[in-house]
Design a protein with these regions (language model features):
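Composition-driven recognition of glycine/serine/threonine/acidic- and proline-rich low-complexity segments
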Residues: 1-112
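Short Gly/Ser/Thr- and Asp/Glu-enriched loop/turn motifs at secondary-structure junctions
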Residues: 121, 250, 392-397
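ATP-binding N-lobe of GHMP and related small-molecule kinases
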Residues: 112-207, 220-230, 234, 240, ...
């Protein structure tokens, strides 16, 4: 038998990967005390060898440079950012090999080129509040900031502008955002942008806003600029309908926003999604609340469903709006007297009840009515499995459930439903009470 271990070592100040290491240790060659410590995954091998005085010598097996596009360089936190150094060696003790170690080190660690890293949250959009407009305002709503998934973006000095990612679709989206930022006046010097991790696009988790703001804030911060939140939002053109994604990026927590002034000559004069409402300005914040740390969020992301964005999204707004004013009144009551008190008092049952009721009224009901049957089946199954509240985020297809215990049964129920259709994945995450993080 062989002990196998794979680890990433990070710089705690900027979260950049220093080393990706894989080790193999023949169990029969290890002293007993060293073996016990080795089975503790949190204890570094170097400490064990030092304390047990196990190392006699090292034998280098190979040392090579891996080009940035070579598949062998594709290790977590290292993939394609730059060329890498690959080193393999054996640790010898009592004339026997006790460790075989393979290390990959980003070559840019040996350069003096500036690099910063941006980590964004994602968000659940619970629902738009007022898609009637009689009040003189429109939009408004509530949403939850999530710790995972999120974008991890690295921006480095370069001789020419370039974008890399393990997913061509992600790179294309980055390039589209860069074009928009340039068109809106952001000066962008030669940079290398690499996406280490991405939020799935067009699934209801706010990927467009997080990517746009992550790039705008990262590039301006890279150049030493400190722009206001409103200026960065203006550069991206986001937040023209919902203010949840923009507030999630800057503040985190559970967000309630006030929407936009509505009518001739006002911020908005028609019902439309954020993607075509860039001139509406950002929605004022009504309130923000801390998300209880003990609450879990289960995300079910079905595969193979039609993505609703662009023209499809615009058409749905035109078809469904204005919604009856009675629906707006009911949703306002649910928000004010159930959802907000539930989070203030950490009352998961009341909060979950509000989430469940939100699905049956106003624009959210319209969003759900156009979904394939798997979405309603997911919602029902996750509730039956014990989630206190289950809903669809934005236009979906992501379905989310909130619970404190019993997450595993909710995950199993969601996976069973998705496997009966076209498949999908689940994500277990927490609420996030801070916004994006930028480190250099």
């Amino acid at each position: 038998p062989v002990n196998y271990r794979e680890v990433d070592l990070y710089n705690k100040n900027n979260l950049n990967t220093l080393i990706h290491a894989i080790s193999y240790a023949p169990i029969s060659h290890l002293p007993e005390n060293a073996l016990v410590r080795l089975m503790n995954e949190d204890e570094p091998i170097g400490y064990i060898m030092r304390d047990e005085m196990m190392e006699s010598r090292r034998e280098i097996i190979s040392l090579e440079r891996l080009p940035s596009q070579q598949p062998g360089a594709g290790k977590p936190g290292i993939s394609r950012v730059s060329s890498s150094i690959s080193k393999s060696y054996r640790i010898i003790h009592n004339n026997r090999p006790i460790f075989l170690i393979n290390e990959i080190i980003p070559e840019n660690l040996f350069s003096e080129r500036k690099t910063i890293r941006i980590q964004t949250p994602s968000r659940i959009h619970i629902g738009l509040l007022d898609m009637n407009g009689e009040s003189g305002r429109v939009d408004g709503g509530a949403g939850i900031t999530l710790d995972n998934p999120g974008f991890e973006i690295r921006i480095s000095e370069a001789d020419a502008f370039s974008v890399t990612s393990s997913d061509a679709k992600v790179s294309q989206n980055v390039e589209s955002v860069i074009e928009r930022l340039r068109a809106n006046g952001l000066d962008i010097p030669p940079l290398h942008i690499h996406i280490d991790q991405a939020i799935p696009f067009h699934c209801g988790l706010g990927s467009g806003t997080q990517l746009a703001l992550g790039l705008a804030a990262g590039i301006s911060g890279f150049q030493g600029e400190s722009y206001s939140d409103s200026y960065l939002i203006g550069l991206t053109g986001r937040g023209g309908t919902s203010g949840i994604g923009t507030k999630a990026f800057f503040q985190g927590g559970l967000i309630v926003d006030a929407g936009h002034r509505f009518g001739p000559g006002k911020s908005k004069s028609s019902f439309a999604p954020s993607s075509v409402s860039g001139g509406a300005g950002f929605a004022p914040l009504i309130s923000r609340y801390e998300i209880p740390k003990e609450w879990n969020f289960v995300l079910a992301v079905p595969d193979g469903l039609h993505e609703i964005h662009g023209t499809d999204e615009v058409n749905i707004f035109q078809k469904c709006c204005p919604v009856p004013v009675h629906d707006v009144q009911v949703l306002s009551h649910i928000l004010l007297m159930k959802l907000i008190p539930g989070i203030i008092e950490h009352d998961l049952d009341q909060f979950g009840t509000a989430i469940n009721e939100f699905q049956e009224w106003g624009f959210k009901k319209c969003e759900l009515d156009i979904q394939p049957p798997v979405i309603r089946t997911l919602i029902d199954s996750m509730r039956d499995a014990g989630a206190s509240g289950v809903g669809m985020s934005s236009f979906g297809p992501v379905v989310y459930g909130v619970c404190d215990t019993g997450s595993s049964s909710v995950i199993s129920a969601a996976e069973e439903v998705m496997n009966d259709y076209s498949g999908g994945k689940t994500i277990l995450t927490k609420g996030r009470n801070q916004g994006a993080k930028i480190v250099s």
